[in-house]
Amino acid sequence: MKKSTLLFSLMAMALSGCNSVLNAPIEVKKLVYQIEHTDPAWQQHLKQLAEIKNYEVKGQFGYISPTERFSAHFDWQYKTPIDFTLALSSNLSTKLLKLQRSHQGLTVSDSEGYSRTEADIHALMQEIIGVSFPIDQFAYWVKGQPAQEGNYIVNEKRQLSQFSYPINQQIWQARYVEYHENRVPYLPKLIVLENGQQTLKIRLDHWNY
């Protein structure tokens, strides 16, 4: 299946009746002050996030590029670095696209019977969305858990505010626009990822762990 066909599969699930995530804000609130990475409360928060190993989160995913714009519901189920599933679907269609990680690599399949497995998961992601997106890192990003030695900023609430991540000579900028603050630890509610040409908006509505 060519990249254009994979993108068409995603676009076929566009939520014409529910485009709120595409119109969601992309800027984080202005920092009151920035927290050092060694701050004890921040380190305690990181420890709490690390303890969330097996989880599920549901929400809405929006993709914007110069030539494509679509959104879909998602269901992300994570168990281990080699056992996770991302399912994309729409209320307006029976179409389903699923990405599943296993020992064999990454499998992409749809509700029409197509299935393909690649050991090179980054190459497959390149075909799907046009960039070698690090889906293996996504498991940590959705929790607001940065790489230990990463380039990131922590806000005054001891929440991850933003970070940058290099991929194939491109820099992805991540901004954590909103958090669920009715539970501990605080978990992200709206994340925006941009690389200058593509924007991914991820609204995380329901957490279960």
Curated annotation (Swiss-Prot):
Name of the gene this protein is made from: lolB
Keyword set, alphabetical order: Cell outer membrane, Chaperone, Lipoprotein, Membrane, Palmitate, Protein transport, Signal, Transport
HAMAP family linked to this entry: LolB
InterPro entries: LolA/LolB/LppX, OM_lipoprot_LolB
Entry function: Plays a critical role in the incorporation of lipoproteins in the outer membrane after they are released by the LolA protein.
GO biological process entries: lipoprotein localization to outer membrane; protein transport
Record note on quaternary structure: Monomer.
Lipid addition sites, S-diacylglycerol cysteine: 18
GO-annotated cellular components: cell outer membrane
Subcellular location: Cell outer membrane
Family, as annotated: Belongs to the LolB family.
Membrane topology of this protein: Lipid-anchor
Main subcellular localisation: membrane
Signal peptide as annotated in the record: 1-17
Protein name: Outer-membrane lipoprotein LolB
Keyword check for Cell membrane: no
Lipid anchor positions (N-palmitoyl cysteine): 18
